[in-house]
Amino acid sequence: MTKKSTIQPCLVCGQSSNSILFGAPSCRACGEFFRRKVISNFKIKNNCLGECSFAKKSMKPCQSCRFQKCLEAGMLEKMVFSRKAIYSISNFEKSILEELEEAYSKLEHGRNETFNPKSDSNPKFCSHEELNNTCTIDIQIILDNLISYFQAKKPMGKEQDDVLKMHFIVPFVLFDTAFRAIGKSSYISPDGTMFGGSYVEKLYQDSSNSKIGVNNGKTSREIMESYWKVSYKILKSEMELLQLDRSEFLLLSALIYWDFGLENQSDKCCENCNTIREKVLKELVKYERKKSGQNALRIAMIMGLLQAVPKALDVMKTCGFLSKIYNLRGSGCPLYAISTNSPPQ
């Protein structure tokens, strides 16, 4: 890392850059492209003759040529999983968005290391037992990688940190699950299996592992299917209409964590949350201005998604209540326990 701030071109696309990403001077867009391709471990198909031009801004290079250009620029795949993978050349403090990107990348890496999801042309659908087990493990991964970042960024004291944590976990899981399912016909579990969406019946289907005394899959599906459809419409459909991107998703996630007016939240914690929320909002405005020019309507529509999260949470709480009352399949979901302020068993 040099001490003097330097502006130099991205060695991949030629745009101005002041960052070293994965070992090479690169703009954030090319660095994020390289990171996604390495983490996905998906073989990029070469559909051209390797003649894509990076000089013509009007022509977008294919993924194969762009990835090869990243390697030629000096980007290293091993650095994607290194703590030193991304750093700024300048002395300026990292933006909250950059920190969120690093924290979420660690979360994704933790999921890949734990679940080892595989790309399959014939994806597997999970049962409610499998989904509950995966969710329990994933919550710990979220705690270790994302929530730990929030708590280190702005410590509030153990009691208030716990208040923010307990009010964040379930909304974030719902928000994250919907975001990762954009463009797909169903939700994707962190282990790569599918559930919900157009295939609710598969989640509650009878299996040899079903517990005795629990209502059959047909009954569970008939009661719960309408709630799945409502939840699908509240969050996932709205995200798809807005074409929410990763940076917008991360900044909104930060606003969900640093919320205010929560039960058992102290006045000081509310004040601190409002202070850091202002910084997050400024970064969102800056990001949208850079992405497509000043667009107040776009920002307003994106912020509207925050109003959808409590609605999705209410639907999930109703599902939890009905599951217990009617002894339905899936009643052991850890999100139900957390949403009623009880720790998951």
UniProtKB/Swiss-Prot annotation:
| Any Pfam family | Hormone_recep
Knocked-out gene: effects: RNAi-mediated knockdown results in reduced egg-laying in the presence of the xenobiotic thiabendazole (TBZ). Not affected by 5-hydroxythiabendazole. Reduced expression of cytochrome P450 cyp-35d1; expression reduced further in the presence of thiabendazole.
Question: Domain NR LBD, which positions?
Answer: 92-342
InterPro entries named in the record: NHR-like_dom_sf (IPR035500), Nucl_hrmn_rcpt_lig-bd (IPR000536), Znf_hrmn_rcpt (IPR001628), Znf_NHR/GATA (IPR013088)
Region annotation AF-2: residue ranges?
Answer: 331-342
Q: Which GO terms describe its biological process?
A: regulation of transcription by RNA polymerase II
Q: Which Gene3D superfamilies match?
A: Erythroid Transcription Factor GATA-1, subunit A (3.30.50.10), Retinoid X Receptor (1.10.565.10)
Tell me yes or no: is Lipid metabolism among this UniProt entry's keywords: no
PROSITE patterns documented for this protein = NR_LBD, NUCLEAR_REC_DBD_2
UniProt keyword ATP-binding present: no
Signal peptide position in this chain? none
Instruction: Cite any additional comment in the entry.
Output: Thiabendazole (TBZ) is used as a broad-spectrum anthelmintic to treat parasitic nematode infections in humans and veterinary animals.
Q: What is this protein called?
A: Nuclear hormone receptor family nhr-176
Organism this protein belongs to:
Caenorhabditis elegans
